[in-house]
């Protein structure tokens, strides 16, 4: 890790890992301050299907969402995802990367990482997003 990596926030570091692991996808980083609640990433998979990913980094079980983020995912439950990187200690052989469907944001806000993810680990997440239609 160079100078930049040392000074990147945890979400920026996670985004770099996502970029590395999702090389076959087109990733568009949405830096959107005008529309609150807009997800972090617009993703186009190899079949030309789009989805969005909200990037979250969590030190504990809880995942924090703004009311705008919750509203966005309730309004757009399909092909929206929340990708979480757990920074805290995890059981052995557990991936630290989790993918959740946007339609489950209310449960995710309530239960945090206790909620079952639809995919764990970069490879499983990539396959899940590859098979969108």
Residue ranges and their predicted role:
Residues 37:
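Beta-rich catalytic cores
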Residues 74-104:
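Nucleic-acid nuclease catalytic cores
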Residues 58-76:
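Mg2+/Mn2+-dependent nuclease catalytic core
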Residues 110-133:
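Charged phosphate-binding loop/patch that engages nucleotide di/tri-phosphates or the phosphate backbone
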Residues 10-15, 25-26, 67-70, 113, ...:
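Membrane-topology and secretion signals of cell-surface/extracellular proteins
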Residues 63, 102-107:
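Sequence/structural signature of beta-propeller domains
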Residues 2-32, 46:
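Acidic-basic catalytic patches of nuclease active cores, encompassing PD-(D/E)XK
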Residues 41-43, 49-59:
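Conserved catalytic cores of phosphodiester-cleaving nucleases, focusing on short active-site segments
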């Amino acid at each position: 890790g160079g100078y930049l990596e040392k000074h990147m926030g945890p979400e920026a570091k996670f985004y770099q890992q996502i970029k590395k692991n999702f090389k076959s996808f087109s990733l568009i980083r949405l830096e959107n301050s005008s529309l609150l609640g807009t997800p972090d990433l617009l993703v186009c998979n190899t079949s030309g299907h789009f989805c969005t990913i909200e990037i979250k980094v969590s030190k504990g079980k809880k995942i924090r969402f703004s009311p705008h983020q919750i509203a966005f995912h309730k309004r757009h439950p399909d092909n929206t995802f929340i990708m979480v990187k757990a920074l805290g200690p995890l059981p052995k052989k557990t991936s630290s990367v989790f993918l959740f469907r946007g339609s489950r944001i209310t449960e995710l806000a309530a239960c945090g990482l206790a909620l079952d993810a639809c995919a764990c680990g970069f490879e499983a997440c990539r396959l899940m997003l590859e098979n969108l239609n």
